[in-house]
From Swiss-Prot:
Keywords: ATP-binding, Cell cycle, Cell division, Cell shape, Cell wall biogenesis/degradation, Cytoplasm, Ligase, Nucleotide-binding, Peptidoglycan synthesis. The gene is murC. HAMAP family: MurC. Coiled coil: none annotated. InterPro entries: Mur-like_cat_sf, Mur_ligase_C, Mur_ligase_C_dom_sf, Mur_ligase_cen, Mur_ligase_N, MurCDEF_pg_biosynth, UDP-N-AcMur_Ala_ligase_MurC. The lineage of its organism: Bacteria, Pseudomonadati, Pseudomonadota, Alphaproteobacteria, Acetobacterales. Pfam families: Mur_ligase (PF01225), Mur_ligase_C (PF02875), Mur_ligase_M (PF08245). Its EC number is 6.3.2.8. It catalyses: UDP-N-acetyl-alpha-D-muramate + L-alanine + ATP = UDP-N-acetyl-alpha-D-muramoyl-L-alanine + ADP + phosphate + H(+). This is UDP-N-acetylmuramate--L-alanine ligase. It is an enzyme of class 6 (ligase). Pathway: Cell wall biogenesis; peptidoglycan biosynthesis. ATP binds at G115, T116, H117, G118, K119, T120, T121.
Length: 480
């Protein structure tokens, strides 16, 4: 990989423990740059960066800058952060996370994956395809890729695959040769204001590709399909289950471990159609078949053969917190999933049904008051595949509470719309007892949310085991 053209000194990341920030910091460190950072609290990303040799301070203080010559911030960092204030006072350049990512992307041919849902998994699948094709890509993802144990991969090849964050409009800065749009549902309207403004930004995201690049669009999603006539000057490849898709899935067979499917590949320019597959994807849900189709579309356009595509999918180990099994006890399976938008929640619960669950118990921690308020109706109708819904308090993520937008409002909204079994979670400490009283062998307990619920999902199997066999639990305590 080429380096940035000038010596830029020590790079300081404010909020280095964030998933996006940590990935960029790790790649810069692997490129040989001096990298350091700070965050408000310890987390797994901070520990991983320290293990890689990057100094991370806990807490924000002007003294943390040290000899830094560049400061990188994310949208979560306020302008009055003491490190940012000190950097500006010392005339140190303050760079947004997306700007730094864009500079890294200029050093490679880049694939940028955007969309409301499925970005992280699709980014990981495309990375797996390029890696299987021995293109040795660099990867910066928005989630932990199980095969890497991190959200980054430093490759020596010409290609880079990145997840593009649309939440603050920063994805418009990213210079890519290939763009992917998985879907487009109303989200982050606190930034965009209207769905129309968000859609216009996606149009620009795709329009930024050069004439020799191409866009990969999910035609199954109506808002994405509506983009096609507006982007007629660009090369477009569509994918999905629709008969109109250029890369179309057929004969999808699902089981408890994943899906098998065939693909019809249509080349509109040459008026040719061929069949490919079957492909085996060790992931549950039709939404993940769609994600795989996006990776196939990229692979086909890059002349990667079908055998390589099959190999990439067969060995795919998934992404952390995407339908991740944290344990099984007494025949009850506990799942941890990042899903926090109604569309994601519905897809995950449907996947649990497809996996053969006797019944599905959803434990939902709404993420942000503003999201719950904006999408309240959708939240109240997205959980029909769960036999029982346990609703936790809203994870604020730094937001102030909004009157009337809370756990109890969601519980009432679900009940009013006909859900027969919805209960509030009084406190996380009561979760295991509640699940123990409800769950039966063969059930899936699906913990959903982008906040602290992941910690509950990790602890729940052990807590259930202790409740199922209290004598063994007491014996273990005595031995300790």
């Amino acid at each position: 990989m080429r380096a940035l053209p000038l010596s830029i000194g020590t790079i300081h990341f404010v909020g280095i423990g964030g998933i996006g920030m940590s990935g960029i910091a790790e790649v810069l460190h692997m490129l040989g740059y001096a990298v350091q950072g700070s965050d408000i609290a310890e987390n797994a990303n901070v520990q991983r960066l320290r293990a890689a040799g990057i100094t991370v301070a806990i807490g924000h203080d002007a003294a943390n800058l040290g000899a830094a010559q560049v400061v990188v911030t994310s949208t979560a960092v306020r302008r009055d952060n003491p490190e940012v204030v000190a950097a500006r006072a010392r005339l140190i350049p303050v760079v947004r996370r997306a700007e730094m990512l864009a500079e890294l992307m200029r050093l490679r041919w880049a694939v940028a994956v955007g969309g409301t849902h499925g970005k992280t998994t699709t980014t990981s699948l495309i990375a797996a395809v390029l890696e299987a094709a021995r293109l040795d890509p660099t990867v910066i993802n928005g989630g932990i890729i199980e095969a890497y144990g991190t959200n980054t991969r430093m490759g020596s090849g010409d290609w880079m695959v990145v997840e593009a964050d649309e939440s603050d409009g920063s994805f418009l800065r990213l210079p890519s040769v290939i763009t992917v749009v998985t879907n487009m549902d109303p989200e982050h309207l606190d930034h965009w204001g209207t769905a129309e403004a968000m859609q216009a930004a996606y149009d620009q995201f795709v329009s930024n590709i050069p004439f020799y690049g191409f866009a990969v669009l999910c035609i199954d999603h109506p808002a994405v399909q509506q983009m096609i006539p507006r982007l007629s000057d660009h090369r477009i490849v569509t994918y999905g289950f629709s008969p109109q898709a250029d890369i179309r899935a057929e004969k999808v067979i699902t089981d408890k471990l994943g899906a098998t499917f065939e693909v019809v590949v249509t080349n509109r320019n040459r008026n040719r159609t061929r069949r490919a597959g079957p492909f085996r994807l060790p992931m549950l849900g039709h939404h993940n078949v769609q994600n795989a189709l996006a990776a196939i579309a990229v692979g086909v356009e890059m002349d990667i053969d079908d055998a390589t595509l099959r190999s990439a999918f067969a060995g795919f180990r998934g992404v952390k917190r995407r339908f991740t099994r944290t344990g099984e006890t007494g025949g009850i399976t506990v799942i941890d999933d990042y899903g926090h938008h109604p569309v994601e929640i519905a897809a995950v619960l449907k996947a649990a049904r497809q996996a053969g669950a006797r019944d599905v118990i959803a434990v939902v921690q709404p993420h942000r008051y503003s999201r719950l308020q904006t999408l309240f109706g959708e939240f109240c109708t997205c959980m029909n595949d769960a036999g029982t819904v346990i609703v936790a308090d809203v994870y604020a993520a730094g937001e102030a509470p909004i009157p009337g937008v809370d756990r109890d409002a969601l519980v009432e909204g679900l009940r009013e719309r006909g859900h027969r079994s919805v209960v509030p979670l009084p406190d996380p400490e009561h979760l295991a007892e509640m699940v123990h009283a409800i769950a039966r062998p063969g059930d899936f307990v699906v913990c959903l949310g982008a906040g602290s619920i992941t910690n509950w999902a990790q602890a729940l199997p052990g807590q259930l085991a202790a409740l199922q066999n209290p004598a063994a639990a007491r014996k273990g305590e005595c031995a300790a």
